[in-house]
From Swiss-Prot:
Positions bound to AMP: 31, 36, 57-59, 83-86, 90, 158, 169
Database matches in InterPro entries: Adenyl_kin_sub, Adenylat/UMP-CMP_kin, Adenylat_kinase_CS, Adenylate_kinase_lid-dom, P-loop_NTPase
Subunit structure: Monomer.
UniProt-recorded name of the protein: Adenylate kinase
Region (LID): 124-161
Catalyses which reaction(s): AMP + ATP = 2 ADP
Gene field: adk
Length: 213
């Protein structure tokens, strides 16, 4: 069983992916992690990724898709796709790759949250620079103010979590990623979760209930 999580920045996709990995033993497909691994191994694809990143450019779909394809070839099912695909073209390429390895997306969960709530969540977010754990001054406060619950490292605010940058990210999401919702509505088991007033645990319980596991 493979699932996809869709939703705007700040909707809680990362938190749900973390829960699915920790509680239900799913494997998260992170294109960022996959690219960093290729770079650390100095592979041909890794060197290409590094070239684009050093220039401050997005790594082209063609390269990202090759890296994802390698991963899919050597991985069993029970995958979570979170943050990939971002565009319609990536989605179509992913379905072709999955088909090649006799895999498919079984469930697509769209976590829908109001823009004003998203902005408030993101601008209140703090992250641990060491373990990458995410906290929120509104919804997920650290046990000790300003410090990570897991390693006591001082929490920081991500540079792209400022109000102006959040607004740009939401606009980019609407232009590039919203079309995916219409696409997957007709291609997979599509489940929309209205999460404005739901806690992360309530969202997780809805997902778990749909998966029947």
């Amino acid at each position: 069983m493979n699932i996809m999580l869709l939703g705007a920045p700040g909707c809680g996709k990362g938190t749900q992916a973390e829960q699915l990995v920790n509680k239900l033993n799913f494997i998260q497909v992170s294109t960022g992690d996959l690219m960093r691994k290729e770079i650390s191994l100095n592979t041909r694809l890794g060197l290409k990724c590094q070239e684009y990143m050093n220039a401050g450019k997005y790594v082209p779909d063609q390269i990202v898709n090759q890296i994802v394809s390698q991963f899919l070839k050597n991985t069993n099912d029970k995958l979570i796709f979170d943050g990939y695909p971002r565009t319609l073209e990536q989605a179509k390429s992913l379905e072709q790759m999955l088909d090649l390895y006799n895999k498919k997306i079984d469930y697509v969960f769209y976590i829908d949250v109001n823009d004003q709530i998203l902005i408030k969540r993101i601008t209140n977010r703090l992250v641990c620079p060491l373990c990458k754990a995410s906290f929120n001054l509104e919804t997920r406060k650290p046990k000790q103010e300003g410090l990570c619950d897991f390693d006591n490292t001082k929490l920081v605010k991500r540079s792209d979590d400022s109000l102006d940058k959040v607004q740009i990210r939401l606009q980019t999401y609407k232009e590039q990623t919203l079309p995916l919702i219409d696409y997957f509505k007709t291609n997979s088991k599509f489940i929309e979760i209205k999460a404005d007033d739901l806690s992360a645990e309530q969202v997780f319980n809805q997902i778990k209930g749909e998966l029947k596991i």
